[in-house]
C-alpha cells in the first residue's frame, strides 16, 4: 500500500495551519538543510534523486538549479509557477489550499540551494482560497522564524511574495510568467538567454512548479535513494494525478510515478460511469495527445508516455467514454487554445484561427472534401514554429484525434451530421 507523501496533510483538520504542519514534522527539512548541508550539497542531493519538474516539461530539477551562475553580480530569484491554467489540472491548488507550509518549506530549501533571497509565487487569480491560505501561511512562517532575516538563527535571509495572475493561460509558460511579473504583457520570450542566466529583471532565476518544490523537503529528510526507489529509475518519485471526466471517482490521487494509465483509471478512479465504456483518455491536460482505450497499459511517466506519442504534462487525466463525439471534443479544445493564444507568433495566431473555422464547419455538418487534409496541413504549419509550446500542444492533440478517431471526422463530413446525436 502506497503511503501518501505530498498529500499526507490534505485531509488533516486544520492542515493549512503552521501548528498542524509542525506537529507532523514540518520545517525539519529546512532545519536540516541549513544545519547540515551547503547550498551546493542540496543541489547535488536533488540531482541524485532524479527529481524531474512536475509542471509539464519533466526537466531534471537539480540540473536546472546547477545552471544558475555562482557569482552573477545580480540578485537571484526563485519563482513558483502556480498559475495552473491547464484544463483538467487541480493538483497545485489542493497543496496551496490544504498544506501551504509544505510549499513554503520547499521554497525555502530550494532558495537556499540556489542562493536566492526572494521568491515570487505566481498564483492563478481565480484561486481565491489558495491565495488567502498562502498569504496566511507566509505570515505564520515569518512570525515563527521560517522566513525573514537570519532564518532559524542562520545567515540565510529569505522572503516570499504572492503575485496574482489575471486569467491568462499563457502565463503557465515560464518566460510569459516572468513578463507578467515585471508588469508587461504576458508573451513568451525568445530563448536563449534562459531564465537561469537572465530571467526576472534580467537576473538569474529558477522557475519551478508547486508539486516540484513540494518534493524537495522530503528528499532532504529521506534521502535521494528513497526518492529514486519510487517508480521508474528515470522518472522516480511520488506523483499527483488529477482524475476528471466521465469516471466514477474523479479526484486527486497520489501514486508512484509510472503506474499504468489503465490501473489509474479502472482501479483507483473506479472506471467509467455505469453503462458506459472508456473510449480514450487524455493523460496530461488538454495539451497532451489522446490515448485510445486499447493503449491504456502505458506507464504514467515522462518517458513511457513520450514513447507512446503523448506526454505526462501536468498529469491532468481526463477520461472520455463512448458517448463522446471526438469531433466536438477536439473543436472545444482547439477553441480553448485559440482563445488563449497570446498572438505573438503568426503560425499560432493565424493557424489556430483557421483550424477553429474548419473544425466548426465539420462539427456543424458542413464539412467539405479535403478538410481533414487541410487540418493536417495547419497542424504541420503550427508545430515547431512558435516561441512556446501552446501551438505545439494544440497541433499534437488534434493530430492524435485525427489519427485515432478519423472515422468520426469522416462521418461528420459524409453524413452531414454528428453520429452521436
Curated annotation (Swiss-Prot):
Role = NDH-1 shuttles electrons from NADH, via FMN and iron-sulfur (Fe-S) centers, to quinones in the respiratory chain. The immediate electron acceptor for the enzyme in this species is believed to be ubiquinone. Couples the redox reaction to proton translocation (for every two electrons transferred, four hydrogen ions are translocated across the cytoplasmic membrane), and thus conserves the redox energy in a proton gradient.
Record-given protein name: NADH-quinone oxidoreductase subunit F 2
Instruction: Name the coenzymes or cofactors required.
Output: FMN; [4Fe-4S] cluster
Q: Which domain of life is it from?
A: Bacteria
Q: Write down the EC number.
A: 7.1.1.-
* MF term (GO), any: quinone binding
One family name in Pfam for this protein:
SLBB
Per the record, the coiled-coil ranges are: none
Return the similarity comment.
Belongs to the complex I 51 kDa subunit family.
Which residues does the annotation say bind NAD(+)? 53-62
InterPro entries xref list = NADH-UbQ_OxRdtase_51kDa_CS, NADH-UbQ_OxRdtase_suF, Nuo51_FMN-bd, Nuo51_FMN-bd_sf, Nuop51_4Fe4S-bd, Nuop51_4Fe4S-bd_sf, Soluble_ligand-bd
Return the cofactor note field: Binds 1 FMN.
Which residues does FMN bind? 165-212
- Which species? Rhizobium meliloti (strain 1021) (Ensifer meliloti)
Q: Where does [4Fe-4S] cluster bind?
A: 342, 345, 348, 388
Q: What class of enzyme is it?
A: translocase
Q: Is Lyase found in the keyword set?
A: no
Respond yes or no to whether keyword Ribonucleoprotein is given for this record.
Answer: no
- Which reaction does this chain catalyze? a quinone + NADH + 5 H(+)(in) = a quinol + NAD(+) + 4 H(+)(out)
Amino acid at each position: 500500500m502506497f503511503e501518501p507523501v505530498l498529500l499526507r496533510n490534505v485531509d488533516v483538520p486544520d492542515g493549512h495551519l503552521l501548528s498542524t504542519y509542525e506537529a507532523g514534522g514540518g520545517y525539519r527539512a529546512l532545519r536540516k538543510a541549513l544545519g547540515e548541508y551547503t547550498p551546493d550539497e542540496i543541489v547535488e542531493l536533488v540531482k541524485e534523486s532524479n527529481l524531474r519538474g512536475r509542471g509539464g516539461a519533466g526537466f531534471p530539477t537539480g540540473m536546472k538549479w546547477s545552471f544558475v551562475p555562482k557569482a552573477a553580480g545580480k540578485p537571484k530569484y526563485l519563482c513558483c509557477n502556480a498559475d495552473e491554467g491547464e484544463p483538467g489540472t487541480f493538483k497545485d491548488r489542493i497543496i496551496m489550499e490544504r498544506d501551504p507550509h509544505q510549499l513554503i518549506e520547499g521554497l525555502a530549501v530550494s532558495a537556499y540551494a540556489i542562493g536566492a533571497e526572494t521568491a515570487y509565487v505566481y498564483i492563478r487569480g481565480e484561486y481565491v482560497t489558495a491565495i488567502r491560505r498562502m498569504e496566511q501561511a507566509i505570515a505564520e512562517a515569518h512570525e515563527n522564524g521560517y522566513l525573514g532575516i537570519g532564518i532559524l538563527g542562520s545567515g540565510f535571509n529569505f522572503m516570499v511574495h504572492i503575485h496574482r495572475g489575471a486569467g491568462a493561460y499563457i502565463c503557465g509558460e515560464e518566460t510569459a510568467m516572468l513578463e507578467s511579473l515585471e508588469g508587461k504583457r504576458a508573451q513568451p520570450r525568445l530563448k536563449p538567454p534562459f531564465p537561469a542566466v537572465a530571467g526576472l529583471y534580467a537576473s538569474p532565476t529558477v522557475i519551478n512548479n508547486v508539486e516540484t518544490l513540494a518534493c524537495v523537503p522530503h528528499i532532504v529528510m529521506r534521502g535521494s535513494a528513497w526518492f529514486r526507489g519510487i517508480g521508474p529509475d528515470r522518472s522516480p518519485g511520488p506523483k499527483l494525478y488529477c482524475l476528471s471526466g466521465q469516471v466514477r471517482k474523479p479526484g486527486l490521487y497520489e501514486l508512484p510515478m509510472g503506474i499504468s494509465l489503465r490501473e489509474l483509471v479502472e482501479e483507483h478512479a473506479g472506471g467509467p460511469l455505469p453503462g458506459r465504456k472508456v473510449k480514450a483518455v487524455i493523460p496530461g491536460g488538454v495539451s497532451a495527445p489522446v490515448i485510445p482505450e486499447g493503449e491504456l497499459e502505458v506507464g504514467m511517466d515522462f518517458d513511457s508516455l513520450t514513447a507512446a506519442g503523448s506526454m505526462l504534462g501536468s498529469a491532468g487525466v481526463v477520461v472520455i467514454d463512448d458517448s463522446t463525439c471526438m469531433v466536438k471534443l477536439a473543436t472545444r479544445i482547439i477553441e480553448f487554445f485559440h482563445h488563449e493564444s497570446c498572438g505573438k507568433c503568426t503560425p499560432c495566431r493565424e493557424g489556430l484561427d483557421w483550424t477553429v473555422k474548419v473544425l466548426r464547419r465539420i462539427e456543424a455538418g458542413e464539412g467539405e472534401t479535403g478538410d481533414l487534409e487541410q487540418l493536417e496541413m495547419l497542424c504541420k504549419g503550427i508545430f515547431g514554429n512558435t516561441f512556446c509550446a501552446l501551438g505545439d500542444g494544440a497541433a499534437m492533440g488534434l493530430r492524435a484525434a485525427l489519427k485515432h478517431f478519423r472515422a468520426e471526422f469522416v462521418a461528420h463530413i459524409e453524413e452531414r451530421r454528428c453520429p452521436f446525436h
